[in-house]
Amino acid sequence: MFGIFSKGEPVSMEGELVQPSSIVINDYEEELHLPLSYWDIKDYKNSWLKSLGEGLSNKTHSALAVSMYEPEKTNFIFTWVLYFEDEKVYVQNNVIFLEECHGFSPENINKFIESRTTHDGDGMKISEWHTDLNSVLDFYHSLNN
């Protein structure tokens, strides 16, 4: 199973309106709070749909933003990146540092994602999860509804 699912109504956390959500990757589940100051939940879903469509089409990767703020006024964006390898999909949590991404726009988020690596510069293993392509396709199709 794979997906990012909203839970209930938006709430205020530390003075910011957020959408309680969770990401599910097979047996793993992590709570998320999607900020709603720049994007609403529809914007997130449209971005995921576009990014997944691109990644599935070119069989490389898709970046699913889970903390979108106005790019000119923020330093980084949290994402979950899906790397497609045949029937397997590897999922890593990723931060896009906007100062390193000249010309960043949310519409082209996949262009600012590097190829999958399994170890960082210090040789430490990068945390990642995996799921199957059909689970990602199910999530992709659910975004159209």
Swiss-Prot record:
InterPro entries: CDI_immunity_sf (IPR053755), CdiI_C (IPR040509). Coiled coil: none annotated. Transmembrane segments: none annotated. Induction: Not expressed under laboratory conditions. Interacts with cognate toxin fragment CdiA-CT. Immunity protein component of a toxin-immunity protein module, which functions as a cellular contact-dependent growth inhibition (CDI) system. CDI modules allow bacteria to communicate with and inhibit the growth of closely related neighboring bacteria in a contact-dependent fashion. Protects cells against the 16S rRNase activity of CdiA-CT, its cognate toxin protein, but not against the toxic effects of a similar rRNase, non-cognate CdiA-CT from E.chrysanthemi strain EC16. This is Immunity protein CdiI. It comes from Enterobacter cloacae subsp. cloacae (strain ATCC 13047 / DSM 30054 / NBRC 13535 / NCTC 10005 / WDCM 00083 / NCDC 279-56). The gene is cdiI.
